[in-house]
Protein backbone atom coordinates (compact mmCIF):
# COMPACT_ATOMS: atom_id res chain seq x y z
CA UNK A 1 0.00 0.00 0.00
CA UNK A 2 1.15 3.54 -0.73
CA UNK A 3 0.38 6.78 1.10
CA UNK A 4 1.07 10.24 -0.31
CA UNK A 5 1.50 13.29 1.91
CA UNK A 6 1.26 16.60 0.06
CA UNK A 7 3.26 19.23 1.90
CA UNK A 8 6.49 18.46 3.77
CA UNK A 9 6.22 21.15 6.41
CA UNK A 10 5.80 20.48 10.11
CA UNK A 11 2.38 18.83 9.81
CA UNK A 12 3.15 16.91 6.62
CA UNK A 13 6.43 15.53 7.90
CA UNK A 14 4.80 14.50 11.18
CA UNK A 15 2.02 12.70 9.31
CA UNK A 16 4.59 10.90 7.16
CA UNK A 17 6.61 9.78 10.18
CA UNK A 18 3.53 8.63 12.11
CA UNK A 19 2.25 6.61 9.14
CA UNK A 20 5.70 5.11 8.55
CA UNK A 21 5.98 4.05 12.18
CA UNK A 22 2.60 2.31 11.97
CA UNK A 23 4.29 0.01 9.41
CA UNK A 24 1.00 -0.41 7.56
CA UNK A 25 2.00 1.07 4.20
CA UNK A 26 4.76 -0.24 1.97
CA UNK A 27 5.69 3.30 0.94
CA UNK A 28 5.07 6.87 2.06
CA UNK A 29 5.73 9.61 -0.50
CA UNK A 30 6.11 13.24 0.57
CA UNK A 31 5.56 15.91 -2.10
CA UNK A 32 6.58 19.54 -1.72
CA UNK A 33 7.43 22.40 -4.07
CA UNK A 34 10.59 23.25 -2.12
CA UNK A 35 13.51 21.41 -3.68
CA UNK A 36 15.40 19.25 -1.20
CA UNK A 37 12.90 19.61 1.65
CA UNK A 38 10.88 16.41 1.13
CA UNK A 39 13.96 14.49 0.00
CA UNK A 40 15.95 15.47 3.08
CA UNK A 41 13.17 14.77 5.55
CA UNK A 42 12.45 11.43 3.88
CA UNK A 43 16.11 10.44 4.12
CA UNK A 44 16.16 11.39 7.80
CA UNK A 45 13.09 9.22 8.43
CA UNK A 46 14.55 6.26 6.55
CA UNK A 47 17.68 6.49 8.67
CA UNK A 48 15.50 6.32 11.79
CA UNK A 49 13.70 3.17 10.61
CA UNK A 50 16.19 0.67 12.11
CA UNK A 51 15.89 2.45 15.45
CA UNK A 52 12.10 2.64 15.47
CA UNK A 53 11.75 -0.74 13.79
CA UNK A 54 9.63 -0.03 10.72
CA UNK A 55 10.07 -1.20 7.13
CA UNK A 56 7.92 1.41 5.39
CA UNK A 57 10.01 3.19 2.76
CA UNK A 58 9.73 6.99 2.95
CA UNK A 59 10.62 9.00 -0.15
CA UNK A 60 10.50 12.68 -1.07
CA UNK A 61 9.77 14.33 -4.40
CA UNK A 62 8.91 17.62 -6.08
CA UNK A 63 6.61 16.09 -8.69
CA UNK A 64 3.63 13.78 -8.69
CA UNK A 65 4.98 10.89 -10.75
CA UNK A 66 6.13 8.87 -7.71
CA UNK A 67 2.70 9.25 -6.09
CA UNK A 68 0.91 7.19 -8.75
CA UNK A 69 -1.35 4.40 -7.51
CA UNK A 70 -1.52 5.74 -3.97
CA UNK A 71 -4.21 4.34 -1.70
CA UNK A 72 -4.50 7.37 0.59
CA UNK A 73 -3.49 11.01 0.17
CA UNK A 74 -3.18 13.49 3.04
CA UNK A 75 -3.23 17.13 1.92
CA UNK A 76 -1.37 19.40 4.34
CA UNK A 77 -0.32 22.04 1.77
CA UNK A 78 -1.59 25.55 2.40
CA UNK A 79 -0.60 28.90 3.86
CA UNK A 80 -1.13 30.19 7.39
CA UNK A 81 -2.65 33.64 7.74
CA UNK A 82 0.21 36.14 7.84
CA UNK A 83 0.16 39.73 9.17
CA UNK A 84 -1.66 42.00 6.77
CA UNK A 85 -3.35 39.14 4.92
CA UNK A 86 -7.12 39.43 4.75
CA UNK A 87 -9.40 36.48 5.39
CA UNK A 88 -10.48 36.64 1.73
CA UNK A 89 -6.85 36.57 0.58
CA UNK A 90 -6.15 33.49 2.68
CA UNK A 91 -9.27 31.72 1.46
CA UNK A 92 -8.47 32.49 -2.18
CA UNK A 93 -4.84 31.43 -1.93
CA UNK A 94 -5.49 28.16 -0.11
CA UNK A 95 -8.34 27.31 -2.47
CA UNK A 96 -5.91 27.62 -5.38
CA UNK A 97 -3.28 25.54 -3.57
CA UNK A 98 -5.60 22.75 -2.41
CA UNK A 99 -7.51 22.62 -5.68
CA UNK A 100 -4.30 22.57 -7.69
CA UNK A 101 -2.52 19.83 -5.75
CA UNK A 102 -5.68 17.71 -5.70
CA UNK A 103 -6.02 17.88 -9.49
CA UNK A 104 -2.38 16.89 -9.97
CA UNK A 105 -2.58 14.02 -7.50
CA UNK A 106 -5.79 12.37 -8.72
CA UNK A 107 -4.48 12.02 -12.28
CA UNK A 108 -2.26 9.17 -11.14
CA UNK A 109 -4.36 7.87 -8.24
CA UNK A 110 -8.00 7.87 -9.35
CA UNK A 111 -9.03 5.21 -6.83
CA UNK A 112 -7.50 6.75 -3.72
CA UNK A 113 -9.04 8.29 -0.61
CA UNK A 114 -8.24 11.90 0.30
CA UNK A 115 -7.83 13.32 3.81
CA UNK A 116 -7.63 17.12 3.97
CA UNK A 117 -5.73 18.86 6.76
CA UNK A 118 -5.38 22.35 5.21
CA UNK A 119 -7.37 25.26 6.68
CA UNK A 120 -10.04 26.53 6.70
CA UNK A 121 -10.64 22.81 7.04
CA UNK A 122 -14.32 22.37 6.23
CA UNK A 123 -14.11 24.61 3.14
CA UNK A 124 -10.84 23.13 1.90
CA UNK A 125 -12.35 19.65 2.15
CA UNK A 126 -15.16 20.82 -0.12
CA UNK A 127 -12.58 22.30 -2.51
CA UNK A 128 -10.71 18.99 -2.67
CA UNK A 129 -13.99 17.16 -3.23
CA UNK A 130 -14.85 19.39 -6.18
CA UNK A 131 -11.34 19.25 -7.67
CA UNK A 132 -11.02 15.48 -7.34
CA UNK A 133 -14.35 14.47 -8.84
CA UNK A 134 -14.40 11.67 -6.27
CA UNK A 135 -17.55 10.37 -4.57
CA UNK A 136 -18.17 11.95 -1.18
CA UNK A 137 -17.15 8.85 0.77
CA UNK A 138 -13.58 9.12 -0.53
CA UNK A 139 -12.95 12.72 0.58
CA UNK A 140 -12.90 13.81 4.22
CA UNK A 141 -11.31 16.34 6.53
CA UNK A 142 -9.18 15.80 9.60
CA UNK A 143 -10.57 17.88 12.45
CA UNK A 144 -12.69 15.84 14.83
CA UNK A 145 -9.96 13.35 15.71
CA UNK A 146 -7.65 16.25 16.59
CA UNK A 147 -10.22 18.26 18.52
CA UNK A 148 -11.51 15.18 20.33
CA UNK A 149 -7.93 14.25 21.19
CA UNK A 150 -7.44 17.64 22.80
CA UNK A 151 -10.72 17.30 24.71
CA UNK A 152 -9.73 13.84 25.94
CA UNK A 153 -6.30 15.09 26.97
CA UNK A 154 -7.74 17.91 29.08
CA UNK A 155 -10.24 15.57 30.76
CA UNK A 156 -7.48 13.06 31.56
CA UNK A 157 -5.40 15.86 33.08
CA UNK A 158 -8.34 17.08 35.14
CA UNK A 159 -9.05 13.63 36.59
CA UNK A 160 -5.44 12.40 36.69
CA UNK A 161 -6.31 9.27 34.71
CA UNK A 162 -4.90 7.54 31.65
CA UNK A 163 -5.89 9.11 28.33
CA UNK A 164 -6.54 5.56 27.11
CA UNK A 165 -9.61 5.37 29.34
CA UNK A 166 -11.16 8.60 28.04
CA UNK A 167 -13.55 8.38 25.10
CA UNK A 168 -15.23 11.48 23.73
CA UNK A 169 -17.35 12.83 20.90
CA UNK A 170 -17.12 16.22 19.28
CA UNK A 171 -19.05 17.51 16.27
CA UNK A 172 -19.37 20.58 14.09
CA UNK A 173 -16.93 22.77 12.23
CA UNK A 174 -13.23 22.99 12.98
CA UNK A 175 -12.96 26.21 14.95
CA UNK A 176 -14.71 28.26 17.60
CA UNK A 177 -18.12 26.80 16.70
CA UNK A 178 -17.14 23.17 17.31
CA UNK A 179 -19.57 21.24 19.51
CA UNK A 180 -18.00 19.04 22.22
CA UNK A 181 -20.55 16.61 23.67
CA UNK A 182 -19.77 15.94 27.36
CA UNK A 183 -22.74 13.60 27.81
CA UNK A 184 -21.25 11.32 25.14
CA UNK A 185 -17.86 11.49 26.88
CA UNK A 186 -16.83 8.71 29.26
CA UNK A 187 -13.92 7.72 31.47
CA UNK A 188 -13.65 3.97 31.84
CA UNK A 189 -17.30 3.77 30.76
CA UNK A 190 -18.43 6.32 33.37
CA UNK A 191 -20.17 9.41 31.92
CA UNK A 192 -17.93 12.41 32.53
CA UNK A 193 -20.77 14.55 34.04
CA UNK A 194 -20.71 12.10 36.97
CA UNK A 195 -17.02 12.84 37.54
CA UNK A 196 -16.65 16.56 36.81
CA UNK A 197 -19.11 19.33 37.73
CA UNK A 198 -20.88 21.25 34.98
CA UNK A 199 -18.97 24.49 35.51
CA UNK A 200 -15.60 22.79 35.19
CA UNK A 201 -16.75 20.81 32.15
CA UNK A 202 -17.70 24.07 30.46
CA UNK A 203 -14.23 25.47 31.18
CA UNK A 204 -12.67 22.39 29.57
CA UNK A 205 -15.00 22.74 26.58
CA UNK A 206 -13.96 26.37 26.11
CA UNK A 207 -10.28 25.45 26.38
CA UNK A 208 -10.81 22.77 23.74
CA UNK A 209 -12.36 25.31 21.37
CA UNK A 210 -9.35 27.58 21.79
CA UNK A 211 -6.69 24.86 21.98
CA UNK A 212 -5.20 25.59 18.58
CA UNK A 213 -4.90 29.28 19.38
CA UNK A 214 -3.34 28.47 22.76
CA UNK A 215 -0.48 26.71 20.97
CA UNK A 216 -0.06 29.56 18.47
CA UNK A 217 0.15 32.03 21.37
CA UNK A 218 2.87 29.94 23.02
CA UNK A 219 5.02 29.13 19.96
CA UNK A 220 4.08 31.71 17.38
CA UNK A 221 3.05 28.96 14.97
CA UNK A 222 0.38 26.30 14.74
CA UNK A 223 0.51 22.75 16.10
CA UNK A 224 1.88 19.77 14.22
CA UNK A 225 2.34 16.79 16.55
CA UNK A 226 -1.34 16.27 17.37
CA UNK A 227 -2.62 17.10 13.85
CA UNK A 228 -0.07 14.71 12.36
CA UNK A 229 -1.01 11.92 14.75
CA UNK A 230 -4.72 12.48 14.07
CA UNK A 231 -4.32 12.23 10.29
CA UNK A 232 -2.21 9.10 10.72
CA UNK A 233 -4.90 7.48 12.88
CA UNK A 234 -7.45 8.07 10.13
CA UNK A 235 -5.05 6.70 7.52
CA UNK A 236 -4.47 3.53 9.53
CA UNK A 237 -8.23 2.95 9.87
CA UNK A 238 -8.61 3.14 6.09
CA UNK A 239 -5.60 1.00 5.19
CA UNK A 240 -6.47 -1.69 7.75
CA UNK A 241 -10.21 -1.50 7.07
CA UNK A 242 -10.68 -1.23 10.81
CA UNK A 243 -14.22 0.18 10.71
CA UNK A 244 -13.21 2.74 13.34
CA UNK A 245 -15.84 5.09 14.71
CA UNK A 246 -14.14 8.48 14.51
CA UNK A 247 -15.30 12.08 14.17
CA UNK A 248 -14.32 13.43 10.74
CA UNK A 249 -15.36 16.26 8.46
CA UNK A 250 -17.66 14.20 6.25
CA UNK A 251 -20.21 15.14 3.61
CA UNK A 252 -23.74 15.45 4.94
CA UNK A 253 -26.69 14.82 2.66
CA UNK A 254 -29.62 15.11 5.03
CA UNK A 255 -27.91 13.65 8.11
CA UNK A 256 -28.55 15.81 11.19
CA UNK A 257 -30.73 17.98 8.93
CA UNK A 258 -27.62 19.26 7.13
CA UNK A 259 -27.07 19.37 3.39
CA UNK A 260 -24.24 19.92 0.92
CA UNK A 261 -21.36 20.57 3.29
CA UNK A 262 -18.47 18.82 4.98
CA UNK A 263 -18.67 19.07 8.76
CA UNK A 264 -17.51 17.11 11.79
CA UNK A 265 -19.74 14.11 12.49
CA UNK A 266 -19.08 10.58 13.80
CA UNK A 267 -18.41 8.16 10.95
CA UNK A 268 -17.44 4.56 10.33
CA UNK A 269 -14.01 4.72 8.69
CA UNK A 270 -12.67 1.79 6.68
CA UNK A 271 -11.40 0.71 3.28
CA UNK A 272 -14.39 2.40 1.66
CA UNK A 273 -13.48 5.70 3.28
CA UNK A 274 -16.47 7.18 5.07
CA UNK A 275 -18.61 4.07 5.03
CA UNK A 276 -21.38 5.50 7.18
CA UNK A 277 -22.31 8.77 8.86
CA UNK A 278 -23.56 7.79 12.29
CA UNK A 279 -26.45 9.83 13.67
CA UNK A 280 -26.65 10.11 17.45
CA UNK A 281 -29.49 11.66 19.42
CA UNK A 282 -28.88 15.32 20.23
CA UNK A 283 -30.82 17.41 22.72
CA UNK A 284 -32.26 20.81 21.80
CA UNK A 285 -29.18 22.76 22.88
CA UNK A 286 -26.79 20.44 21.04
CA UNK A 287 -28.91 20.66 17.88
CA UNK A 288 -28.86 24.45 18.11
CA UNK A 289 -25.08 24.50 18.52
CA UNK A 290 -24.61 22.17 15.55
CA UNK A 291 -26.94 24.32 13.45
CA UNK A 292 -24.91 27.41 14.36
CA UNK A 293 -21.69 25.62 13.46
CA UNK A 294 -23.12 24.49 10.13
CA UNK A 295 -24.23 28.04 9.44
CA UNK A 296 -20.66 29.20 9.91
CA UNK A 297 -19.42 26.58 7.43
CA UNK A 298 -22.09 27.58 4.91
CA UNK A 299 -21.05 31.22 5.34
CA UNK A 300 -17.48 30.29 4.46
CA UNK A 301 -18.72 28.37 1.42
CA UNK A 302 -20.73 31.44 0.38
CA UNK A 303 -17.55 33.51 0.66
CA UNK A 304 -15.78 30.98 -1.54
CA UNK A 305 -18.47 31.29 -4.20
CA UNK A 306 -18.38 35.09 -3.97
CA UNK A 307 -14.62 35.13 -4.58
CA UNK A 308 -15.13 32.87 -7.57
CA UNK A 309 -17.86 35.14 -8.94
CA UNK A 310 -15.54 38.13 -8.48
CA UNK A 311 -12.83 36.34 -10.45
CA UNK A 312 -10.43 36.24 -7.49
CA UNK A 313 -10.21 32.46 -7.72
CA UNK A 314 -9.61 30.70 -11.02
Curated annotation (Swiss-Prot):
Q: Which UniProt keywords apply?
A: NAD, Oxidoreductase, Tricarboxylic acid cycle
Q: Which residues bind substrate?
A: 81, 87, 119, 150
Give the similarity note: Belongs to the LDH/MDH superfamily. MDH type 3 family.
Q: Gene for this protein?
A: mdh
Instruction: Spell out the CDD domains in the cross-references.
Output: LDH-like_MDH
- The lineage's top-level taxon is Bacteria
Where does the chain bind NAD(+)? Answer: 7-12, 32, 94, 117-119
Q: Which protein, by its recorded name, is this?
A: Malate dehydrogenase
| Gene3D superfamilies registered for this protein in UniProt | Lactate dehydrogenase/glycoside hydrolase, family 4, C-terminal (3.90.110.10), NAD(P)-binding Rossmann-like Domain (3.40.50.720)
Q: Would the keyword NAD be found if you checked this record's keyword annotation?
A: yes
Query: What does the record give as the active site?
Result: 174
Q: Which organism is it from?
A: Salinibacter ruber (strain DSM 13855 / M31)
As recorded in UniProt, its EC number(s) are 1.1.1.37
Q: What the protein does? A: Catalyzes the reversible oxidation of malate to oxaloacetate.
Q: Which InterPro entries match?
A: L-lactate/malate_DH, Lactate/malate_DH_C, Lactate/malate_DH_N, Lactate_DH/Glyco_Ohase_4_C, Malate_DH_type3, NAD(P)-bd_dom_sf
Q: Which GO terms describe its molecular function?
A: L-lactate dehydrogenase activity; L-malate dehydrogenase (NAD+) activity
Q: What class of enzyme is it?
A: oxidoreductase
For this chain's UniProt record, which GO biological process terms are given? lactate metabolic process; tricarboxylic acid cycle
* Catalytically driven reaction(s): (S)-malate + NAD(+) = oxaloacetate + NADH + H(+)
Presence of keyword Oxidoreductase: yes
Amino acid sequence: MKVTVIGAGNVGATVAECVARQDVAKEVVMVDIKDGMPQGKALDMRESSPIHGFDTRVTGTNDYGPTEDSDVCIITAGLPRSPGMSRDDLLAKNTEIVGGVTEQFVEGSPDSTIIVVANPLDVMTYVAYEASGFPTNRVMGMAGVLDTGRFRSFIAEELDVSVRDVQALLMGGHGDTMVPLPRYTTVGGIPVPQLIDDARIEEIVERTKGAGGEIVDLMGTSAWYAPGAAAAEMTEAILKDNKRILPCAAYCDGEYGLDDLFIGVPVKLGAGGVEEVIEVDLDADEKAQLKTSAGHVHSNLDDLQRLRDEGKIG
